[in-house]
Amino acid sequence: MATDRRVELSSVRNARSLGGLHAASGRTAHGVFCRSDVPLSLTEEDICVLRSYGITHVLDLRSEAEVQAHPSAAKACFEYLNVPLQGGDKIPQTREEVPASYLNMTMGTTQMARAMRFLADAPDGVLIHCTAGKDRTGVVCAILLMLAGVTDDAICEDYAQTEIYMEPVLVQLCAQNSALNFDALVARKENMQAFLDAFREKWGGAEEYLRYLGLHPGQVNRWKAKMTKQG
């Protein structure tokens, strides 16, 4: 069950492991990647929990302005890199705009290449986060899961977990700001599926995309093997 992958942290709502998902050669491995919303604070217990999941590195996908306004507490505890994704800080106004906004992030190939090399070169586990852990994090994690041979249904199901964990926060945000469209903010499975379809039409697939970014085939294959386990 996807809910069994949740990582319990005191100040983070939307943290979960990318391990345990059905993949082409078995299941995705734990201790490789976790995803979350921004950890604004981390207790000693939280740090121990993340380390128990193998986390030694953190990739922050937010804009420089977001990082300056709300620094990630993970920076002081782990090997940290901030890579703002193209258009990632722009909020879609309607649900129909969501898949196109996700595809636009993949067009920022300089930023995406830097992020993917960081993930590929990390010797241990990496926590990937943005602000809510939905859009930018969702795009990067979808590419990783495609590479591992995870089915579209499982990728969309993982993405939709954010709706469960973050809905109270989104309801509050929309109540405070009438310009926000709740329907465009929630993590709908159909939005992720539309992105996956558009991504393949544009790039061919995850391996083709990573090679376009400059990762060589041997590096991609080792990365794929690291992400999956037999059985």
Segments from the language model and where they lie:
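Ser/Thr-glycine-rich phosphate-binding loops at phosphate-binding pockets of nucleotides
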Residues: 132, 136-137
